[in-house]
Amino acid sequence: MKKILALVLALSMLCGLMVTAHADDKIKIGVSIWSSTDTLGSECKRLIDAAAAALDVDVQWVDQAHISEQVTASAETLAMADCDGIIICNSASAEMGSVIKTCDENEVYVAQFFRVIDPDLNPDEYAQAKASKYYVGAVHESEFDNGKKLVTILGEKGCKKIGLEGWEPGDATFQGRWEGYKAGVEEWNAAHADAPIELLEPQYGRTTTDTGRATAEAIIDANPDIDALIVAGGGGDTLLGAIAGIEAKGLTGKIAVVSTDFLPDLDAKLQSGAMAAESGGHYADPFFAFLLVYNAIKGNYETSEDGFYNMVFPYMFVDSPESYAAYAQYFTGSELPYNADEIKALAELSYDDLAAACAALSVEDVVARHAK
């Protein structure tokens, strides 16, 4: 009997040590992103690295170029690297079936950023996400409203024929923006029968400057009468290529360019006429996905096998150097929308309070907190 009690005691102590060791382990979160070095990706990395430092979290990055095979492989890579959680910017929602399966099998929490699974377009993946204990949720923008707003800005600037450059056919974010562009055109034309807008079918410029430029030039060559070009996104390099192509044709300022994903020199681009307007400031989106996964790992946010968290992040719009100035002062360079103390405080919030903080983020919000 004494031997049995001694064995039970030893096992209890061993289990206690194992639990303690696990509790003391540093949290590790993987980030699967199209690129951590382009305009938007590097800004995302800057804020996530700051959050990781403030919360004492290890981060591992994988750049997957929005190539489907690399997106799904990135989840496997990060799971094998002993990540406790993953945040991912996938390309097509179909990829999430494999990603969620990998995370379920490895008991790794996962959240999407800049993306959400549409229940109508991808019902199987949506059902899989709802049923997964390890799929935490998604942080994303209202791409539909973003698209409508940009088209409205072009209409107000007098544009009549708009070219459209996407980056990857079937990309969920592009599809949402495209629906918004089309709805914006329809709404504008219904209210301005004497000044209708025509939106061309999309051409795809991938995510490099070379392909972005070649695609923009091809659109212009096929439609020399366009007076506007929407470069839907793609991380920034696609837009830089398109701007270079327009400049090479001597059409800077003659073709109004709008896009999503703020460039680091947007003020100069607005001043020169290379850009007419841009939506952006959303590089903090993955920061909130990071906090979702962080809290799921710590057990603060319960995950469900019949639903997930869905957080909407606000876009900011600028159409002049003046409107960009405040953003540049408080969001770029060495500045971040949240400092270390604020990051720690956000990490302690309930989900509802965190979602409210996310929805409230704006230039005015940051100025109020950080203005000296």
Task: Show where each model-derived region lies.
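Positively charged n-region of N-terminal signal peptides that target proteins for export
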Residues: 1-8
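A residue-level marker of the well-folded mature domains of exported/periplasmic proteins
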Residues: 22-372
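Intrinsically disordered, low-complexity Ser/Thr/Pro-rich tracts
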Residues: 1, 17-23
